[in-house]
Amino acid sequence: MKPNYSIDIAINCFRPGGGMESYTFDLVRGLSAHGIKPTVFAAQIDTTVPEYRQVNTHHVNQKKIPKKLRPFFFSMQLAKLRQNRNIPLIACNPSDYADIFVCGGTHLGYLHNMGKTPNLLDRLIIRRNRTNYLTAKLVMAHSHLMQHELINLYGVPSEKIRVIHPPADTARFYTKPEEIPATRARYGFKDDETIFLFPSTGHTRKGLDLLAEFFEHTDLPIKLAVAGLPLPRPMNNVIELGFYKNMPELYRAADFTIMASLYEPFGLVGIESILCGTRVVFSDNMACTEVMNENAGFFFSRQNPETLAQAITQAVSLKQQGKHKITSPMQALTYNPTLTHHIDQTLNILY
């Protein structure tokens, strides 16, 4: 890719965060490595991050707009700022007329899987997303699950959708087996117990209730280690770790990573865990399982609790045999998770 090509990126907040904010930073770093300095249009811009030096910026001034309404005005403001700019747009937020609209989740899919009835704000979000999909030249779906929802819930033509799974930070998440004994000792993880790591910033959506029901009543030598939000109550066989910044270390120290999400448009947690050499025990509705093979771990159905018990029992058996760690993570995945590959795919559909 020639370094003089230009790209615009739209995002509400250009700052460290989760979801699309994190993905936008990935795009910026990846494009920079290709010699491309994109222009970011955002309402909030963090000038202290290294990525700021890799972009040009345009501030979308929303100070006079009520906070809840700001996302609905962003697209109109963006259009005015980009008048007469013959430069392709990658929308990482709900913006219209994108050359690539990045879909990392759908609101209708979220409401359906969470069993929620849409309120007025939800209906406005759904309406806004319909115009995003309608006016975009292409929609990048971060999973086949998203492709399915775009087609079946929103009526987006299949020929308009490209499935490109999101990248993982392979420079940060990797195996380091020599560290594991010391890290486990520091956390108090016992060698005769199988530790299942549950990273969660939303216990209901991530399926804590289903997992706790099993862990609290089992006689197996297992512990559920919860990283993230505090527990709603004390639980038998459950350890509360709190928020932890060094997630690669935590993934490596655990025997397995476990999750039973009600709705997971992709789930980079699974990819990150595998890259660190730790197999997963995941519900099969999580979209990241699309890119995993049988070497990645064990999978179960949320609709059948017996399959959860079977998966955990198999995991414990593998740990007791000393065969639970993955030595070649890439062989457990069916896609290339590197940022370089993701940027190549993105540029291929953009130009």
Mark where each language-model region is.
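Short alpha-helical donor nucleotide-sugar binding micro-motif in glycosyltransferases
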Residues: 243, 250-254
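Conserved donor-binding/catalytic core segment of Leloir-type glycosyltransferases
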Residues: 190-206, 212-215
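A charged, aromatic-enriched C-terminal amphipathic alpha-helix characteristic of glycosyltransferases
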Residues: 303, 320-350
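Short hydrophobic beta-strand element within catalytic cores of glycosyltransferases
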Residues: 279-282
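Acidic anion/phosphate-binding donor-loop and adjacent secondary structure
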Residues: 151, 168-185, 192
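Conserved acidic donor-binding segment of nucleotide-sugar-dependent glycosyltransferases
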Residues: 294, 298-305, 314-320
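Carbohydrate-associated surface elements
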Residues: 145, 167
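Aromatic "clamp/platform" in nucleotide-sugar-dependent glycosyltransferases that forms part
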Residues: 262
